[in-house]
Amino acid sequence: TSASNLAFSKPAYPYGTDHGYGLRSEIGTATFPTFESIREFIPKEDWWPLPTDEQLKNDPNTVWNKHFFGKEAWNAKPIDYKKAVNEQFGESDSLEEFCEKAQLLNMEVVKGMYEAWNDKMWNDASGLLLWMSHPAYPSFVWQTYDYYYDPTGAYWGAKKACEHLHIQWNASNNSIKVINTTAKDLRRVCAKAVVYNLNGKEVSDCSRIKWLDVSAGNIAEAFV
């Protein structure tokens, strides 16, 4: 199932655009490592609180900036990253708590990128390569697993979106599509969409099932 695609952005990105897909050879995001890794390279006295927005924008001397969470990595938008974690998953009281929540954002962002290309497979979307998988220096950007080889949420997001048979939601138009990246045609497979309320109870009137065929290396729309 899917619930990513950066739906919090206005418009939802990357689903909110209809151009610029093609074969992207270099794309990446800010990516917080796990707390276990961060404590290896950020001194304990600097753990908390995180740098202010003003520091992230202008201060070149923080230890965070030296590891690309600050003005040195302006193109990774550290202020927006911090804001997204806080707004989507709640304010944190410690670095450890923030790191745990950041992994959820890491997963959603990278899963959303791959799902956007899935959604337009062979329609101005032929491939996506991440920059990059692994940093040569302890860092807060461009990685799926960190300097210490610990996977971040970005790794698991990419793995989920790139599974051979995948079902996903488009945040821009609410369509549900089945993605088949295998070399085998699939006949009469079942797509099921389940809606839950805020108490975790299934809303049966809103749930749907559809049987469909999906050609090899292609996509099929299940619901809109």
Named regions from a protein language model:
Residues 1-7:
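Aromatic- and carboxylate-enriched substrate-binding clefts and catalytic-loop regions
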Residues 9-187:
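Substrate-binding clefts and catalytic carboxylate motifs of secreted carbohydrate-active enzymes
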Residues 189-224:
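Intrinsically disordered, low-complexity Pro/Gly/Ser/Thr-rich segments with frequent PxxP/GP/PP motifs
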